Amino acid sequence: RVVCAEIDRFAAAAIALNAELNGVTVEVIDSDLIGRPLEGALAGIDIVLAGDVCYERPMAERVISWFRLLAAQGVEVLLGDPGRAYLPKTGLAQAACYDVPTSLDLEDREIRPTTVWRMVG
């Protein structure tokens, strides 16, 4: 079972289209799940994949706090980050690095080094 939480309706629609094109079933939940206990729709979650959530301090603090709690409960938490200022300096182990092509319309360079981190401890 794959559950995806996305509060942006355009991104949720893109997730559904991507899943359909790839022949997979994804349950899209269009609500903010940060901080919720692992029960109900979240029961049985064993891995959380998150991308680029440390772009502003309030969001990063809220998300990272919840991710640390999940990791302490045995959930594997992987976080993709392109070098944002509010990424924590501790409690992470590097899992992978990628050079991601970007658009100069959106970024200040054509390639952005991006790291996938695993929450630890």
Residue map of PLM features:
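S-adenosylmethionine-dependent methyltransferases
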Residues: R1-G121
